[in-house]
Amino acid sequence: DDPEIRRLLVAAARDRSNPRAHENSVDVLAQECRSGRVCAKGAVRNALMVALRYDRSAAVRQKALEGLQPYIGDDMGVRDAVLEALLNDPDPDIRTEAIGLLTPVEADSSVREVLQTVANQDDNPYIRNVSREFLEQVSQQIQ
């Protein structure tokens, strides 16, 4: 809970010159967010969204995605970052996990639109199928 340590972790999460320190920092920040301790809107959450959107390492993007999960229902920026990952991440495991994280916001029309796009256009048949199944579940719950 030390603000100085948090500041250093955020700085290391943004600095890719030392890949191991970068990945470890994202991991620690993500763990803190999942535990609910230090991920209020601001630098930590933003660092995880940047890592999810732009990091070359799938492992780092995965950790960032996991850290953002508790905030998808409350933070439009997080929701948009997860939807962007679903549409654009090159790793099918990350796209698949992104679908699973959307449950708290499944009734949101923008979420359904993205899922429909993925169900129709994703290169990976498994992801298309998971998206269709998710949309079917949402349709049944709405009716």
Question: Which positions does each model-derived feature cover?
Answer:
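Hydrophobic core/packing positions within alpha-helical solenoid repeats
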Residues: L29-E32, G36, G67-Y71, L102, ...
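Conserved hydrophobic register position within alpha-solenoid helical repeats
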Residues: S25, A64, E97-A98, S131
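HEAT-repeat alpha-solenoid elements in large eukaryotic scaffold proteins
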Residues: R20-L29
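Alpha-helix N-cap/helix-start positions at coil->helix boundaries
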Residues: N18-R20, G42, Y54-A59, M76, ...
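PEST-like low-complexity intrinsically disordered regions enriched in Ser/Thr/Pro and acidic residues
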Residues: D1-R7, S25, A64
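Amphipathic alpha-helical scaffolding segments comprising HEAT/armadillo-like alpha-solenoid repeats
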Residues: D2-A13, G36-L52, D74-L86, D108-A119, ...
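Eukaryotic acidic, Ser/Thr-rich intrinsically disordered low-complexity regions
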Residues: Q116-Q143
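Mid-length scaffold segments of soluble, non-membrane domains
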Residues: R37-A40, R56-R61, Y71
